[in-house]
């Protein structure tokens, strides 16, 4: 993944800008304006979310690609915002448990090899009462659309590392987080999800049956 995004970094904003206009509309604004306190953005990329965060948050950003982070650092300097940026893997976050009030991930889980492990890590670093905000393209619940996604998925995974059939709500639920908002747009392809970490762990179906 690092090699793909390092190579993509110089023209990433041009490509993703077209996709965003077609699919995601004001999704970044929706995600970032909900952030409070100490905030971790996972896969911050070139920093496209930076203009949308409230200026009173303490923002930390990680990304697997150093080249993408270079672009994010340049934008942060242009915005005169001291963002703490570092190279990091979403599947193994280098932060203590319960160290963030908000975790934000936009167009992220679609490109991570193990999205469930990434969500597990996001839940781990959230403080009790903290919020997880996700924006991504996902497996559509509409059968004809999903059939097309199934056809395209192997090609996109192979050449771009981009997965079309992810279901982040299931991964979030399995980590004991409480989903407060789940909305689908654009034929079910785009999902906006907001969840919180309860003060006490929520028993999932598996744990209730004594399997974990």
Say what each PLM segment does:
Residues 1-11:
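N-terminal, positively charged/glycine-rich alpha-helical extensions of SAM-dependent methyltransferases
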Residues 116-128:
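A short glycine-rich, Lys/Arg-flanked "PGG" loop and its adjoining helix->strand segment in the class I
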Residues 102-114:
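A short SAM/SAH-binding and catalytic strip from SAM-dependent methyltransferases
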Residues 91-103:
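A short acidic, Gly/Pro-enriched loop at the edge of an enzyme's catalytic core
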Residues 18-38, 48, 52:
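Conserved alpha-helix/loop element of class I SAM-dependent methyltransferases that forms part
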Residues 64-66, 114, 137:
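Short beta->alpha hinge that forms the Motif I/post-I loop of the SAM-binding pocket
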Residues 15-18, 133-192:
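C-terminal alpha-helical "lid/dimerization" subdomain adjacent to the S-adenosyl-L-methionine
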Residues 38-92:
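Class I SAM-dependent methyltransferase SAM/SAH-binding core
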